[in-house]
Amino acid sequence: MQIDISTLDAGSAGKAELPEEYFAATPRADIMARVVHWQLAKRRAGTHKVKGMGEVSGTTKKPYRQKGTGNARQGSLRAPQFRTGGAVHGPVVRDHGYSLNKKVRRLGLISALSQKLAEGKLVVLDTVAGVSKTSELNVKLKKLGWGRTLVVDAVVDEGFARASRNLIGIDVLPVVGANVYDILQHDTLAITAAGLEGLKRRLDGIKAGANEEIAA
């Protein structure tokens, strides 16, 4: 299938070929949800920690004798029922990440791309190079009316990244960093012509069994 190539000036720059295998698949909401959950789990710092009964400071002496006081028996002031006691089954420092099958990650990315195209929110740009002023880029984006936009390029252009850095609602990623979560978080997905070729190679590589990483 073919799609028009646009410019940042809302002009036309020809057509690009979109592989139906990657852009016309039936979006799988369940698969995308699994990939997003996996990405967000990997992002968690996992630095949460509370002290248990064996870690809080305090005496290890028995508070009072076992029998004869009329009180409930107690063995330690560090027990969780006391104000200064340790927590029971509290959070510990750990890694929340887990493995997800490469084929599932690939299908999730294909589903996200296909969903954006089906919604009419996928745009192919000729290039983003040459725009290095924030004010200039802001004017262009307002005319295009894309809303919150994710721009995917083969390699992030430094000038464009610098121009977009101070604008709310526009993010730039290289092909290797394109991921389901960021695609779904934005209204419009804009892929440069070079980025489109890189994305095809990346998906072809996953299909062939090459090592692949998804930014999380």
From Swiss-Prot:
Pfam families: Ribosomal_L4. Part of the 50S ribosomal subunit. This is Large ribosomal subunit protein uL4. Belongs to the universal ribosomal protein uL4 family. The keyword Ribonucleoprotein applies. The gene is rplD. It comes from Acidiphilium cryptum (strain JF-5). One of its GO terms (biological process) is translation. Keywords: Ribonucleoprotein, Ribosomal protein, RNA-binding, rRNA-binding. HAMAP family: Ribosomal_uL4_B.
